[in-house]
Design a protein with these regions (language model features):
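Transmembrane alpha-helices and adjacent helix-loop boundaries
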Residues: 2-342
Length: 342
């Protein structure tokens, strides 16, 4: 029992150190980077939130969704329309994006989970996402194929202080960082909560979970809805950052991004998708100037990771750490025995 408590405490300390290092790294970006890299770091923060929201259903609940771009897109357009056409705060836009993503996910999940499962469920989510993509592309209100432009970055009013102007300097980057940090914290709490353990049980043994009294359908629908809320928040963060939204954010290839992030970084560990986002975007940025090379490098990296580390980069790191501990174990025990004999 004491050993388990020590391992849990050690894991919590490791995660706290990792989170602090990531936060410090992002905070340092405006100090040394140009505007292009700062924008890339902002996009990485948005994609981290998107990937973690997707991994709630993929890695935690064991469901595959090919249409998660729908919730990102509806959140982005809900926030973008409000910021463009109404005098509202950016927090109202974010809340609208999260609610829109959650509402759409709840509606699609309610239909899809009742009608299909496994591969058929994944295809059904893709079909709904493509329907939304067509709707956005054909609706004048959303800007059709030309996209939604004129999205403002309203200043944040702070009582007793001067307003924080998100349209000047690196204000939008720091706002995105603060919002993403809070959303990542929320995802972390969900992952390690009692409901998170319930979803893990549903993923591993749904029949046994049902026998123990867990409402499997309700648990999956709740997870799917919460995942949609997270994806909607990610889209809402993206709208004022990009200030331009096109129907491509609802296309199938945008739904493939969080899947690639999770497979690359690992689905069984909370920080796996974060590692996947950073490696993916880092490779894409470093090879962007050579036509066709980016896809080759990313594809080869993903193939190598899947073959060498089936659990992703984060899973591979944990596996290597466990192997190192096992190797140190016998030598440490022998040294301890020799010390007692002396």
């Amino acid at each position: 029992m004491n050993s388990n408590v020590a391992q849990t405490a050690g894991g919590a300390r490791t995660q706290a150190v990792l989170a602090a290092v990531l936060l410090a790294g992002f905070l340092s970006v405006p100090v040394w980077a140009d505007k292009g890299v700062i924008f890339l770091a902002s996009v990485a923060l948005v994609q981290i939130v998107f990937a973690l929201s997707f991994n709630t259903v993929f890695g935690l609940a064991g469901m595959v969704s090919f249409g998660h771009a729908a919730y990102f897109a509806i959140g982005a357009y809900a926030c973008g329309l409000l910021l463009r056409g109404a005098d509202v705060s950016i927090f109202t836009g974010l809340a609208a994006g999260g609610l829109a993503g959650g509402a759409l996910a709840a509606a699609i999940g309610w239909v899809a989970l009742r009608r299909a499962s496994g591969n058929y469920f994944a295809i059904l989510t893709l079909a709904f996402a493509e329907m939304l993509h067509i709707l956005i592309a054909k609706t004048p209100w959303f800007g059709r194929e030309d996209g939604l432009t004129g999205i403002k970055r309203p200043a944040i009013d702070v009582p007793g202080l001067r307003p924080i102007d998100l349209a000047q300097g690196d204000g939008i980057f720091y706002f995105t960082l603060a919002a993403a940090a809070l959303l990542v914290l929320g995802a972390w709490v969900l992952w390690y909560s009692g409901f998170g353990r319930c979803l893990a049980a549903v993923r591993q043994e749904p029949d046994r979970a049902a026998f123990l009294g867990i409402d499997v359908h309700r648990a999956r629908l709740t997870a799917f809805t919460l995942s949609g809320v997270g994806a909607g928040f990610a889209g809402a963060l993206y709208a004022p950052l990009a200030q331009l939204l096109t129907p491509e954010v609802a296309q199938w290839h945008f739904s493939a991004l969080p899947i690639l992030f999770c497979l690359l970084g690992g689905t069984s560990i909370f920080w796996g998708p974060v590692a996947g986002v950073l490696v993916f975007l880092g490779l894409e940025h470093s090879t962007r100037n050579i036509i066709g090379l980016s896809e080759v490098v990313i594809g080869a990296t993903l193939l190598l990771v899947v073959l060498v580390f089936p659990g992703g980069l984060a899973g591979g790191a944990v596996r290597l750490r466990q192997m190192a501990r096992r190797k140190r174990g016998p030598s440490t025990a022998m040294a301890s025995t020799q010390g007692r004999q002396a």
